[in-house]
């Protein structure tokens, strides 16, 4: 999957629901970053470790009951070392309990269109119905890396340390960081049921790709297959960029405004995929809302910029007002009428 567009470049059995193991933690990380972004928690907040969180088996940082760590330390431990105890501690901190956090995970999955996803815990340990498809994993991975690209601060870190009872070393579980020059993350997973899983991300020439491997029979195979998928994407596709955010497109007439017109600017950048070697070029058409009347707030939608390749519409972005335009007062309106009358 290409991250900026969400377009799937290659897939096989992508809708089959399977145990995801610790790749589950992509959703856990996404909800942590959401909570920080929304102001619910801060990176410096202290988290008291519960007995339940400390009891997690599998990959862990050996947290003790009643130990206190910051949100930042626990998040780093999840992203780098795939720590189950840290994941459950953060789930309890955000949700109040792991079960309540799992409800948030499933709600988020539904809102993202993850059609087969069913979470039963925050860390990915095997249960009967904890299942995701490769497409589900690609969708949540895309949301994490495009909405919070700063996560790569941790997902690209090979080794780090934290301090609790003693200094504890963190080593990244993602060997792709050593094997693939353009790797940016993201998350490994392995259990008896899930076998070996991977959500791999890599960025080259401004294009970021996501490769998902599930149920590989050995740990090295998941990395080799992910590299093959990433190489395929980078070798065969390129991104075409539209106009830049804030670029001025046209002057829009404003009825009864202090100013006669306002600049319509691009609200967001548009990108689309094309085959490498193709001569595909983007063309545009402007569609403006008729009869825009003052007052107009800065950022008001004034129309749309429509992108085409040939005769095929590829997408649309909003055109918004660059500045605010207040309603004209009676004196201004009188001056305009006088000008029109005597010109």
Where are these regions (language model features)?
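Active-site-adjacent loops and short helices of periplasmic peptidoglycan-processing enzymes
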Residues: 1-149
